[in-house]
Amino acid sequence: MGCLGNSKTEDQRNEEKAQREANKKIEKQLQKDKQVYRATHRLLLLGAGESGKSTIVKQMRILHVNGFNGEGGEEDPQAARSNSDGEKATKVQDIKNNLKEAIETIVAAMSNLVPPVELANPENQFRVDYILSVMNVPDFDFPPEFYEHAKALWEDEGVRACYERSNEYQLIDCAQYFLDKIDVIKQDDYVPSDQDLLRCRVLTSGIFETKFQVDKVNFHMFDVGGQRDERRKWIQCFNDVTAIIFVVASSSYNMVIREDNQTNRLQEALNLFKSIWNNRWLRTISVILFLNKQDLLAEKVLAGKSKIEDYFPEFARYTTPEDATPEPGEDPRVTRAKYFIRDEFLRISTASGDGRHYCYPHFTCAVDTENIRRVFNDCRDIIQRMHLRQYELL
């Protein structure tokens, strides 16, 4: 009898060989992808709304990508420049919208505050009427008279007095910055500077990923909206996170959140930090704490109009700790204030610390590129240690 076991045709044998080779290639690629995945540091940016998370992401793009271009992967410098200019042009509208929102919000608040604020020059009332009349106009085209009225109102001492009470209503942080630049922004050939783009406020909704490389190490940074209704999306990002960067608006001690106009913003951040620190899915993930908006905190403390103890009574008994390291020339009142806020967060992390994750605080100013460069460089060793521990290599 003939042997039937070797009845495969030449074509079948070639096909099986090709399949084996294809499987090997797939397996090799999967192993390579796995190595790249395991070598990537995934950073999750969390924090309450308007704490500065998106500004941190913008700084990473300035420092480690090609600035403000679309993808950040162009090898051709001319293409990168072209994309960067294109994105800046699209941001002009966002900046103009910030400017419009700022002057609208201030003049609308004047009559609603208790006690109300009067115009220093009553003849400017027609300008107020104009600003309020265009408040909800869709696709506003920013005619010259808008800039004229906005500038005249911004120079009115009554409007300035209302601005000084902005903790009593909801005003974007960049209001003064852009109102001071009306003459620049109104120009037809206006191109935003990097600082303009850093200051520009656009509500983050959803999850945004930014990829960048530092000294051949891959980083993926996830920016998630901080408003209450956005937080349910956070859990989608918890898988394989190397570290959490929790961003706090330190200057918000005298402000309330937009969502309910009642809850103190800094208290909201403390509550949120506590819930993240104690979350059972995150008990092994350390937190890098960015105590942000130090420039605005210093302004408020030195102005002396809103005292921290009026909102956090325990500050009256607080003394600056021995480990405090003031910035050169820093006023002792500012040092005391910023370390008080730091210690409020550290009380939470030490109260329920189990040695499985740690909190690393840093004082930041997200609109200051050099500050963020220095802080992120300081954090890289911490992130590397977390990454090694994550894959049980340490």
From Swiss-Prot:
This is Guanine nucleotide-binding protein G(s) subunit alpha isoforms short. Residues 42-55 are annotated as: G1 motif. PROSITE patterns: G_ALPHA. Residues 196-204 are annotated as: G2 motif. Its main location: membrane. Residues 219-228 are annotated as: G3 motif. It comes from the Eukaryota. Its EC number is 3.6.5.-. Residues 1-23, 68-91 are annotated as: Disordered. There is a cross-link at K300 (Glycyl lysine isopeptide (Lys-Gly) (interchain with G-Cter in ubiquitin)). The modification Phosphoserine is found at S352. It is an enzyme of class 3 (hydrolase). The keyword Ribosomal protein does not apply. SMART domains: G_alpha (SM00275). It comes from Bos taurus (Bovine). It is found in: Cell membrane. The GNAS locus is imprinted in a complex manner, giving rise to distinct paternally, maternally and biallelically expressed proteins. Crystal structures were determined for GNAS in complex with an adenylyl cyclase catalytic domain that was reconstructed from ADCY2 and ADCY5 N- and C-terminal domains. A lipid is attached at G2 (N-palmitoyl glycine). Guanine nucleotide-binding proteins (G proteins) function as transducers in numerous signaling pathways controlled by G protein-coupled receptors (GPCRs). The alpha chain contains the guanine nucleotide binding site and alternates between an active, GTP-bound state and an inactive, GDP-bound state. Signaling by an activated GPCR promotes GDP release and GTP binding. The alpha subunit has a low GTPase activity that converts bound GTP to GDP, thereby terminating the signal. Both GDP release and GTP hydrolysis are modulated by numerous regulatory proteins. Residues 8-23 have a biased composition (Basic and acidic residues). A lipid is attached at C3 (S-palmitoyl cysteine). Residues 39-394 form the G-alpha domain. Residues 288-295 are annotated as: G4 motif. It is a lipid-anchor. GO terms for cellular component: cytoplasm; heterotrimeric G-protein complex. GO terms for biological process: adenylate cyclase-activating adrenergic receptor signaling pathway; adenylate cyclase-activating dopamine receptor signaling pathway; adenylate cyclase-activating G protein-coupled receptor signaling pathway; sensory perception of chemical stimulus.
